[in-house]
From Swiss-Prot:
GO MF terms, alphabetically ordered: ATP binding; DNA binding; zinc ion binding
Native source species: Lacticaseibacillus paracasei (strain ATCC 334 / BCRC 17002 / CCUG 31169 / CIP 107868 / KCTC 3260 / NRRL B-441) (Lactobacillus paracasei)
GO biological process: negative regulation of DNA-templated transcription
Name of this protein: Transcriptional repressor NrdR
Location of the ATP-cone domain: 49-139
Taxonomic lineage from the root: Bacteria, Bacillati, Bacillota, Bacilli, Lactobacillales
Designated gene of the protein: nrdR
Domain of life: Bacteria
């Protein structure tokens, strides 16, 4: 495995353990050249999942795009990387469980928001504001009110 730090082609596995309910293997590696430690994940390769974007174009599903959006939404919030990875895993599992090779970006956004709402309200609102592209303050306020109603019914 190539080192992300020095790009040397040799590393050794320091630790290896199952993760994601046994569907993946997490490996902790150390570069034999510079000693840099990094983590890799090994998963079974799935059939490609295509995302139908709002403009009708299609692109391959990319877990990293969701993770980057979550990281941005959860900035300076008490949301761990593990929680965000878990959301991405859960969303991907939901998409694959549907059994379709193509899924709309809208469906992906809704899945992400439903999971994020259970983790952190502020991160949810941040994600929703970008995803739903609120046009004005009234739409934003309506989303907050809807969220507050759901919160009251939980208690």
């Amino acid at each position: 495995m190539q080192c992300p730090h020095c790009h040397h082609n040799s590393s050794r596995v320091v630790d290896s353990r199952p993760t994601d309910g046994g569907r993946a293997i997490r490996r902790r590696r150390e570069c034999e050249n510079c000693g840099f430690r990094f983590t890799t994940f090994e998963r079974v390769e799935q059939t490609p999942l295509l995302v139908i974007k709002k403009n009708g174009t299609r692109e391959e599903f990319n877990r990293e795009k969701i993770l980057k959006g979550l990281i941005r939404a959860a900035e300076k919030r008490p949301v761990t990387m593990e929680q965000m990875q878990s959301i991405v895993d859960s969303v991907e599992n939901q998409l694959r469980a549907i059994g379709e090779n193509e899924v709309s970006s809208q469906a992906i956004g809704e899945f992400v928001m439903s999971k994020l709402a259970d983790v952190d309200d502020v991160a949810y609102i941040r994600f929703a504001s970008v995803y739903r592209q609120f046009k004005d303050m009234s739409v934003f306020m309506q989303e907050l009110q809807d969220m507050m109603k759901k919160e009251k019914t939980k208690k």
